[in-house]
């Protein structure tokens, strides 16, 4: 395979789209903490001085949405009017309906149950049709692609040096991007690092550039991946004072590639944040990552992409596909059979096995839903790896 470049981006928690994602998931978590069986599809829009919450929510509890919004925005760091967005003074509007009964009936009683199949996990149908994708690769410790792995770590570091006072002139909005050179399918060096960091107007670009390279880039990018030709593009427009919702309207679900694999894997198109686990956009994507990660951890492939497709109101997936891109120890048809034997991908089974009716979602609404070594996420476990290895190799 010839040498090639691959680029992935991440954003900080103060990016307007991520503000929206975190608000949606904070509302979801609050509801699930009181009503684990709630149906939630919560969408958020943030713009100058305004947060709009909309969607469909059916639950048996009350949550204080304006307070959740303000506390989430406060935690992110928009605490002063001069940032263009202030947790204490922004308006919070809500427009919420209940889940459509036509959708609810298919989730409450799956096609299989209506046809007489008496099985606990066949009672709950998928909340929508769609294609969900999971991916894993052995090129990083978290089994994530190197470009998104590094981009997320840079974004988290950028937020950390702002919050802990190391670089007090930074403000909440920010973006990172990493271009990695591959040789024969393996990452060999970092070609380009891009960081755009919102800042106080009085700080000059030279100071920002020097500080971000020293305090953000150097602690994160492995020395072995840096060369004399590695480029650093720090605030390449020259100025980033106006940011956050004042500069760009933020919407839930607008960073689906950042949330997943940085473009290295295909994507079915469904977003995650604000959705309870009966929405297979979320739960089945987590399950597909769980499957792919266990296949790679088992040594059955160096790279693995898992596709799962669903029909609304039907419990059993309508299709499964495993692609190892030529890295598989065994053929893909055999891998697909192993997946069906060792993983139950019906929505109720996913929810049960991964214990998804819990308030665990706000924590993944920024810096990626996958490969989070800082969190104990059920879909990141590799507890099936040994049995897959034994079944796949006959050992």
Curated annotation (Swiss-Prot):
Binding site for K(+): 43
PROSITE patterns with a match to the protein in the record: ADOMET_SYNTHASE_1, ADOMET_SYNTHASE_2
Residues annotated to bind L-methionine: 56, 99, 248, 279
Name of this chain's protein: S-adenosylmethionine synthase
Subcellular location field: Cytoplasm
InterPro entries documented for this protein: ADOMET_SYNTHASE_CS (IPR022631), S-AdoMet_synt_C (IPR022630), S-AdoMet_synt_central (IPR022629), S-AdoMet_synt_N (IPR022628), S-AdoMet_synthetase (IPR002133), S-AdoMet_synthetase_sfam (IPR022636)
Record text on subunit structure and interactions: Homotetramer; dimer of dimers.
GO biological process, one term: S-adenosylmethionine biosynthetic process
Function: Catalyzes the formation of S-adenosylmethionine (AdoMet) from methionine and ATP. The overall synthetic reaction is composed of two sequential steps, AdoMet formation and the subsequent tripolyphosphate hydrolysis which occurs prior to release of AdoMet from the enzyme.
GO cellular component: cytoplasm
Domain of life where this protein originates: Bacteria
Ranges for region Flexible loop: 99-109
A UniProt-annotated Pfam family: S-AdoMet_synt_C
Keywords in alphabetical order: ATP-binding, Cytoplasm, Magnesium, Metal-binding, Nucleotide-binding, One-carbon metabolism, Potassium, Transferase
Binding, Mg(2+): 17
Chief localization: cytoplasm
The species this protein was found in: Desulforudis audaxviator (strain MP104C)
Pathway named in the protein's UniProt entry: Amino-acid biosynthesis; S-adenosyl-L-methionine biosynthesis; S-adenosyl-L-methionine from L-methionine: step 1/1
